[in-house]
Amino acid sequence: MKLISILLIATLVMAACRSTKKIQKAIVTKDSVVVVNSPVPTHIDTVQMVNDLLRNCKQISYGTFSAKIKVDYFNSKGKQPDFVANVRLRKDSLIWISLSNDLGIEGIRVLITKDSIKVMDKLANTIQIRPLSSIQEISQIPFSLSDLQELLVGNPIFFNRDSITYYSKTANGFSLLSMGAVFKNLVTINNSFQVEKSKVDDLDGKRNRTADITYYEYETKTGVLFSTYREMNLSQQTKLDVQLKFKDYKFNEEMSFPFTVPKKFKRIQ
């Protein structure tokens, strides 16, 4: 379960941008002004700029999604064994994950539905079934099946469209800050309307929880603008660095979700 938590928490900070209807406050710092001789933008001008910007950042529309993700991570003890996560999902229905080592030997298979998570350990011959709320308890992050699916695909989460409190333009792109109920999220978008960075901070200072993610290697092989390599720096008491490399990703194709538990497997708590 701890390994599953690492993968899910790592994907948690994959946030992009979505449309907005209002801005509570617009701040333009001196360092972020590009055209020095231009008039200072009014509040209405800034609202229009942000609306135009977010209209160009489109969400990924999908029915199904699958990908092979190579996961490398480092904690306080140094580099940990890397693994490969084969992920498949059907929108609003389920998430299927198969974890294997670099030799292709599968160790764990996971099935997540709207109300439960099942973890089958093929090496220990055990099956563990828990309510989906257990993921929230492990990660201390409130999310649903839909949230997890959006995160894996790369669509926005914890980026409140009605709570943008900061907007600035630089020579290289734009920055937007959203204040949500749990997190604040500073997103940097380049001039090609690709999300380059996302910095997520917990609003509860006692948890001292933060995450930085950088997006690389965008491509449109499947007709969808998709970041195939991401680096994350997660911090909450201890530091965790994660690298995700997406391969063989597919959208809207037929796929199966095999999850048959052998009779000899023992159910554990």
Where are these regions (language model features)?
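Positively charged n-region of N-terminal signal peptides that target proteins for export
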Residues: 1-6
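C-terminal motif of bacterial Sec signal peptides marking the signal peptidase cleavage site
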Residues: 13-16
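N-terminal leader/targeting segments and the immediate start of mature chains
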Residues: 18-70, 74-80, 266-269
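Gly/Pro-enriched, hydrophobic low-complexity segments
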Residues: 19, 23, 164-269
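Edge/loop elements at the starts and ends of beta-strands within beta-rich repeat scaffolds
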Residues: 56-65, 76-81, 88-93, 169, ...
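Post-signal peptide N-terminal segment of secreted/secretory-pathway proteins
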Residues: 67-109, 115-116
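An acidic-aromatic
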Residues: 94-145
